[in-house]
Design a protein with these regions (language model features):
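Conserved acidic segment of CheY-like receiver
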Residues: 15-27, 32-33
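Conserved active-site segment of CheY-like receiver
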Residues: 24, 94-98, 117-119
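Short hydrophobic/Thr-rich beta-strand motif most characteristic of the beta2 strand and flanking loop
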Residues: 40-47, 55
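Acidic catalytic/metal-coordinating carboxylates
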Residues: 48-51, 71-78
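Short amphipathic alpha-helix used as the core "switch/output" element in two-component signaling
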Residues: 54, 76-88
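Active-site beta3 strand of CheY-like receiver
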Residues: 59-65
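Active-site residues of response regulator receiver
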Residues: 67-71, 95
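Short, flexible helix-to-coil linker/hinge segments that flank and couple to helix-turn-helix
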Residues: 101-108, 112-144
Length: 144
């Protein structure tokens, strides 16, 4: 996989930023993991919201990347739980849906970045860094 131009590995102290990834589609998890590595340390890739909460409780990542629509707890519900417990610094939603209502729900829940899966190759890494800096990030497909 060819990396987006301008991407550079950034470290927190002496280590890469660590993340947990959640998506119910195995192929999507694999593609996103390949996109993120080696820039970030992917601690675990899980398939649902409950597993996401459990992984963040165990691993305390810097950032979580989560699909919205997953079995059981959806990405917004799981993200709300993770943020409420103070288990990570930032959450990035990765979704197929650009519905304004979903975007607003995510932002109200404290999720800092919303990236469409169609925009992920070009925008996921910048979105993660923006979220870690405390900034809000909406991918191009959401801003339209």
């Amino acid at each position: 996989m060819v990396r987006p131009s301008g991407a550079e590995v950034t470290y927190r102290g002496n280590r890469r930023y660590r993340l947990v990834l959640a998506d119910d589609h195995p192929d999507m998890r694999q593609e996103i993991q390949e996109l993120l590595d080696p820039e970030f340390e992917v601690l675990r890739a899980v398939c649902d919201g409950a597993a996401l909460v459990a992984a963040t409780l165990e691993l305390h990542p810097d950032v979580v990347i989560s699909d919205i629509q997953m079995p059981g707890l959806d990405g917004i519900e799981a993200g709300t739980e993770v943020l409420w417990r103070g288990l990570c610094e930032a959450i990035v939603v990765l979704s197929m849906y650009s519905d304004r209502h979903l975007v607003q729900m995510a932002m109200k829940a404290g999720i800092r970045a919303y990236v469409l899966k169609l925009d992920a190759f070009d925008e996921l890494i910048p979105a993660v860094y923006a979220a870690l800096r405390g900034e809000c990030y909406l991918s191009a497909g959401v801003r339209r």
